[in-house]
Amino acid sequence: MADLEEQLSDEEKVRIAAKFIIHAPPGEFNEVFNDVRLLLNNDNLLREGAAHAFAQYNLDQFTPVKIEGYEEQVLITEHGDLGNGKFLDPKNRVSFKFDHLRKEATDPRPYEGENAIESWRHSVETAMRAYVKEHYPNGVCTVYGKTIDGQQTIIACIESHQFQAKNFWNGRWRSEWKFTITPSTTQVVGILKIQVHYYEDGNVQLVSHKDIQDSLTVSNEVQTAKEFIKIVEAAENEYQTAISENYQTMSDTTFKALRRQLPVTRTKIDWNKILSYKIGKEMQNA
């Protein structure tokens, strides 16, 4: 092991450490960071060399953060990235600095977004927050209005997690939805992601995603938002149901096939006569 460490350059060590951090399961960033810190044994190298990994993890995971002075959380996503460590809270129309290692928001300041699309963004946000409140007890959503390639675009992100370290499992739901505001009809594109880690007496992870496409009738802001939420609700319900049914099927078939139906002797043990068996006698005499 020592020989291997001597062969690795600092750059290679940081690259390996960064991969561990980026792939940390939901709710386990600190544990992975602390383990990597011990392995690398160079705090300055880790902080400077793996800073991009801290940021990438939070962006990928839709990390929720609370801004002091504001009631609701906002998600850290690529769509709200203003550069130089600053992010956008489109609901409260403020920018803020975000510490990717401490996961803290500071220095909130007024920020004027794209006013031309604000009425659409607000309508979708209102409908989306009602939907998230109903379906995700711990859910957070952030809705952006941006001009992308000359097209006014609405982007809605949802995050919901359950961290149960005492029960040896953590899980996170993420979904991202987009559509452009075009006359008559438009295309809705979504991606749904589930990641769960169970680690009591083992190490099992569920990592799943599904891409969605559907058409949306565009009318006024409020009605379009309602129709958009119908698409979101139907797709997310179908996905969650399919995941549950698939696991039930695996439990009834695949996992049963992995279990031996009979001992190697092909005969069942008569537990009422266990003492007559050699092992029973040995246990009795012990």
From Swiss-Prot:
Gene Ontology cellular-component annotations: brush border; cortical cytoskeleton; F-actin capping protein complex; membrane
Example of a GO biological process term: actin cytoskeleton organization
InterPro entries: CapZ_alpha, CapZ_alpha/beta, CapZ_alpha/beta_2, CapZ_alpha_1, F-actin_cap_asu_CS
List of residues that carry N-acetylalanine: A2
Database matches in Pfam families: F-actin_cap_A
GO molecular function list: actin filament binding
Modification sites for Phosphoserine: S9
Keywords from the UniProt entry: Acetylation, Actin capping, Actin-binding, Phosphoprotein
Subunit-level organization: Component of the F-actin capping complex, composed of a heterodimer of an alpha and a beta subunit. Component of the WASH complex, composed of F-actin-capping protein subunit alpha (CAPZA1, CAPZA2 or CAPZA3), F-actin-capping protein subunit beta (CAPZB), WASHC1, WASHC2, WASHC3, WASHC4 and WASHC5. Interacts with RCSD1/CAPZIP. Directly interacts with CRACD; this interaction decreases binding to actin.
Family assignment from sequence similarity: Belongs to the F-actin-capping protein alpha subunit family.
Protein role: F-actin-capping proteins bind in a Ca(2+)-independent manner to the fast growing ends of actin filaments (barbed end) thereby blocking the exchange of subunits at these ends. Unlike other capping proteins (such as gelsolin and severin), these proteins do not sever actin filaments.
Name of the protein: F-actin-capping protein subunit alpha-2
Organism: Monodelphis domestica (Gray short-tailed opossum)
Gene name for this UniProt entry: CAPZA2
